[in-house]
Swiss-Prot record:
Described function: One of the primary rRNA binding proteins, it binds directly to 16S rRNA central domain where it helps coordinate assembly of the platform of the 30S subunit.
Cellular localisation: Plastid, Chloroplast
Protein name, UniProt field: Small ribosomal subunit protein uS8c
GO molecular function: rRNA binding; structural constituent of ribosome
Protein source organism: Solanum lycopersicum (Tomato)
Family: Belongs to the universal ribosomal protein uS8 family.
Coiled-coil residue windows: none
One Pfam family from the record: Ribosomal_S8
GO CC annotation: chloroplast; ribonucleoprotein complex; ribosome
Gene: rps8
HAMAP family in the record: Ribosomal_uS8_B
């Protein structure tokens, strides 16, 4: 049985955010690097650096947290895996869902690479819906 690397990075980031950890280390692959670059560009994480250990590459992510002393801690990241190995979900560019009226993003795997829902709509291409982030 294969590993679902996208679900692994989503779970790692979600667990670190719930545990209020500032740094997360995930395995580096082409698809994880592309997803992390989208998260960085959209402002969901603060920093990314590539780390090598025993001939294996890892991405070290610095998460963005809201600290408010008056209220209890709130998670800033909500991630949900949509298309999975057992059930692939595809969409054309006209039917790509809008998350929270455009406040969240949808990450898609298209024929032109991994991109956000806004980029896919502008280019007029659809693809496999990987995850929602809000």
């Amino acid at each position: 049985m294969g590993r679902d690397t996208i679900a692994e990075i989503i779970t790692s980031i979600r667990n670190a955010d719930m545990d209020r950890k500032r740094v997360v280390r995930i395995a580096s692959t082409n698809i994880t690097e592309n997803i992390v670059q989208i998260l960085l560009r959209e402002g969901f994480i603060e920093n990314v650096r590539k780390h090598r250990e025993n001939n294996k590459y890892f991405l070290v992510l610095t998460l963005r947290h809201r600290r408010n002393r008056k209220r209890p801690y709130r998670n800033i990241l909500n991630l949900k895996r949509i298309s999975r190995p057992g059930l692939r979900i595809y969409s054309n560019y006209q039917r790509i869902p809008r998350i929270l009226g455009g406040m969240g993003i949808v990450i898609l795997s298209t024929s032109r690479g991994i991109m956000t829902d806004r980029e896919a709509r502008l280019e007029g291409i659809g693809g496999e819906i990987l995850c929602y982030i809000w």
